[in-house]
Design a protein with these regions (language model features):
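Post-HExxH zinc-binding segment in Zn-dependent metallohydrolases
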Residues: 164-206
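Alpha-helical transmembrane segments
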Residues: 205-214
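C-terminal or late-domain output modules
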Residues: 134-138, 149, 192-196
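N-terminal pre-first-transmembrane soluble regions of secretory-pathway and organelle membrane proteins
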Residues: 1-87
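Short, flexible helix-coil linker/hinge segments at the edges of structured domains or between repeats
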Residues: 120-124, 132, 150-151, 178, ...
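Active-site scaffold of zinc-dependent metalloenzymes
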Residues: 90-145
Length: 222
């Protein structure tokens, strides 16, 4: 379902009025009240989101590209087709019964590093949410250790949780989309950028330690 179809004035008014059926409908699309947020506040946030998504669509149509934040340019012709996004929505629906199909996705033209796969972007002021993935996924499903469906499902899970300011368990739920049991188990451990360093540093130092031990053994036997 497109954002314009879901985020209508009538639907948002029903949310403001506390309609249980409207709340259930939005919940299934990954839109739900934040902790401590009442129905009126939730409706106001949805209204800001609808405006932001509408402006994004209009700016792309008129200008061909927009820059939602410094260093990241989104192009109209780089929008991820619904058929490809649908791969990930199947996974989020199966895992969480949530289908955030209103979240726009784009293939990134910029290079963010050899190991970069994708990320979700959120603007707290306008409530705009979107995600970008490596352009290589336009033509292939796999890139290094990344799987296109898994990566998009991961970022869409983040997008659906944009109203929850909870860092501790966020990666746990996002990594539940992983096909690998190892990534599902360890993925939630990487909360900050320093966590991955704590995990990788001992692995990177292992060859050095082995070499030092080997040299000492050689001197002792000599």
């Amino acid at each position: 379902m497109s954002a314009s179809t879901l985020l209508t004035g009538k639907a948002i008014a029903e949310i403001a009025g506390g309609s249980a059926s409207a709340l259930r409908k939005f919940d299934r699309h990954g839109l739900f009240p934040a902790p401590g947020e009442d129905c009126q506040q939730f409706a106001e946030r949805l209204s800001r989101l609808a405006t932001a998504l509408d402006e994004l669509e209009k700016n792309l149509a008129q200008q061909g590209s927009v820059e939602p934040c410094s260093g990241i340019e989104l192009r109209k012709n780089s929008a991820i087709p619904a058929a490809i996004t649908g791969e990930a929505l199947e996974k989020t629906c199966k895992l969480y019964d949530v289908k955030p199909d209103w979240v726009p996705g784009f293939f990134a033209d910029e290079s963010f590093g050899m190991l970069w796969g994708g990320c979700a972007l959120t603007d707290p002021e306008s409530n705009l949410v979107l995600f970008i993935i490596r352009k290589a996924f336009l033509k292939k499903r796999k890139f290094l250790v990344y799987d296109r469906q898994e990566l998009m499902a991961h970022e869409l899970t983040h997008a659906a949780h944009q109203s929850i300011n909870e860092i501790k368990y966020e990666e746990y739920f996002a990594y539940r989309t992983a096909q690998s049991a190892l990534r599902r188990f360890f993925g939630g451990c990487f909360i900050s950028k320093y966590d991955s360093l704590c995990f990788l540093l001992p692995i990177l130092l292992l060859p050095v330690v082995r070499q030092v031990a080997k040299q000492r053994q050689t001197r002792n036997t000599g």
